[in-house]
Amino acid sequence: MPPREDPNGDASSASPSDPVPPPPQQPQPQPQPAKGKGKKKDEKKDDDLSEEDQALKEQLELYVVRAQDPDPGVQKLALESMRQEIRSATSSMTSVPKPLKFLRPHYGTLKAYFETMPESDLKKYMADILSVLALTMSAEGERESLNYRMIGSEGDIGSWGHEYVRYLPAPDDMSALKIAFEIYMKFGDFANALRIALLLYDKSLELKPIFTATDDFQLKKQFAFIIARHGLSIEIDDDIAADENEKEALQDIISNIKLSEGYLTLARDIEVMEPKSPEDIYKVHLIDGRGATSSSLDSARQNLAATFVNAFVNAGFGQDKLMTTPSDSSSSGSSGNWLFKNKEHGKASAAASLGMILLWDSDSGLAQLDKYLHSNDIHVVAGALLGIGIVSCGVKSDCDPAFALISECFSRDESIIRIGAILGLGIAYAGSQKEEVRENLTAFLTDSQVPLEILVFSAISLGLVFVGSCNEEVAQTIICVLMERSEPELAEPIMRLLPVALGLLYLGKQESVEATAEVSKTFDEKIRNYCDVTLMSLAYAGTGNVLKVQKLLGICSEHLEKGETHQGPAVLGISLIAMAEELGAEMAVRSLERLLQYGEQNIRRAVPLALGLLCISNPKVNVMDTMSRLSHDADAEVSMAAIISLGLIGAGTNNARIAGMLRNLSSYYYKEAGHLFCVRIAQGLVHLGKGLLTLSPYHSDRFLLSPIALAGLVTVLHACLDMKSIILGKYHYMLYILTLAMQPRMLLTVDEDLKPLSVPVRVGQAVDVVGQAGRPKTITGFQTHSTPVLLAAGERAELATEKYLPLTPVLEGFVILRKNPEYHED
């Protein structure tokens, strides 16, 4: 064995999906005449190399020739020199080390020679070199790198560089997390163990052992709050809590019964209970010029926009100035008047908006929506059914009133009422995997007489209810629909949501989607590629898988025939996969900006939505500027997508800069009904819940991703890929699916009886302290406030008093505080 080299030699940091090498011993092309372009190109290529690089290249080529020398002594020297060059090559993380670059053309030659070598130490040395070269050369799926590693010499593989070591094993992250889980359990840090269990949920880790490992009832209540925030619905059985009162208390917390109460406590503390009207949001008096005198253009559409703005702004407050007024005791009150200022399907959205205003308060909500269920107007009934779903979103109840009320209306013949009922069920039971819902909705999918729109909404609702479950029966039903429909039907804009419904079943489940993806290759060519890309991007959502991002970027770089639409979902897929961590997200933003410059039109239309998803409820200045530029784009679809995305990145932040941009856009587009509608929706989103809500699917210090919240966002974004036909058409009520992602961005500290407890906390920018020894500062640039407080994107809170101890390490949402027995007041 030759002496070991510097163990930090970074031997390779190339992507494994680089082009496949040329076949072994490919004949060199003959030089062309001097006049030909080829010669000049070759000369130019060599001119680009510095003298040092040129010398290295020639040296390596000499080693390749000598490595095939019949004399073992010469061979050994050449191989050792080559090993040394590769191992001592240092490079940045993003580029291929030079020795690998220069050896690339000779990979085939060395591979072919390796097969002819007799068994010896020299053959092992050659295998080591080929193993490292295979990182950048071998075809995907061949696993040549591992193959040559096994044949090669035993020993310290770390000396070839950490990228090489990282690339060799299959993903070990799951086993590492399981070990972390076991360590947390062993040392009694159950709250952190629960966070890991939620991350690996459905992948073999159960939640019950965490509850049974402790007898501390207060701690169990804190676990219940964490699970409720994640959106999981689990049953509390006798093993978790033997006492009936304790069992009921835990079930109430997991069912989110306390959410509305906590949210309103925050609102009262911040003094934002006063209802706001759409006019308060538009702030027309601040606009100078033409948009100030509100145009009477398409007043029904303006009323519809006002309905959405009103619903978004007053979400969860239980009162507003349009739908819930004191004279509301009779249906002839002003809420009735506003309802009938909308036309046809606009009335459905208006009635459903009441559900959003009363969000999470199911008792009061169901009582107020009940009167609309008995209306003679089918659109009002449909809206009421959707409203029942919205008000019950994330809130479970023993008697299941939402299912009882909604399922009564399935027998109605009117298409709009059925859609209201179907979407209502999807929103109310998202993530619950409730069997009764499956039976009801599958009946629509298997009925060949049902209109297309009912098929699509049934599939979407099934996708939401069974999100991430990999449920074979539901998948099979949706696949049958996709196979049986004719080409003209598949060309309908709304049909693009069927592959999304199928993808939701595999959200974040990675390889589990492969069997279904194979089946999708047999679909009609109209929808085949769209389905394939959508399935892949949803299955790898939130994983940060670089290879899949590369594949999607490859799809975006193709030049398509007219009529192909699958590049839109590919662009969304890039942000879906890359949103997992900060660095990946920043790199994706850069890639998306390149696509804006060089991409085809259908790619440019999706880029604003992808950026909106990457920075949701997190208004970054560079993304904001890009959106501002695109909102004036010559292509109407691009500018509308950019306007909606301005709303998404500012969702629930009350960001003054975005609010100003949107006001200017409302005057710029005052004659364009479609654009103005988008501006209004964006204004409503920016002031979501008067600035108390977020749409971000990440929580618990960006460690956990709520699949239900992500499912809601993905569905709406795919609908926005065809803004004119879906959101600006008659399916505007799809915007209510965003309810699934709405969560208060609060820190509410409570005592052991769950009564609000005001304590001082420091709130500042989170600092990444992973791997640092001791107790480093976890936040920077903090301010001290008294709870309850709001947490913006990227902020973290810590207690500023030692009087209490929190029962969870991550201060977000509901946090139970316990008195510190060792604390003595001076």
Task: Briefly describe each language-model feature range.
Residues 2, 6-10, 14-18:
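Long, N-terminal intrinsically disordered regulatory "head" regions
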Residues 3-4, 8, 24, 33-41, ...:
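Long internal repeat-built scaffold domains in very large eukaryotic proteins
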Residues 17-25:
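N-terminal intrinsically disordered, low-complexity tails
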Residues 102-106, 110-113:
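Residue-level recognition of alpha-helix termini/interfacial anchor residues
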Residues 426-427:
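Helix-loop-helix module between adjacent transmembrane segments
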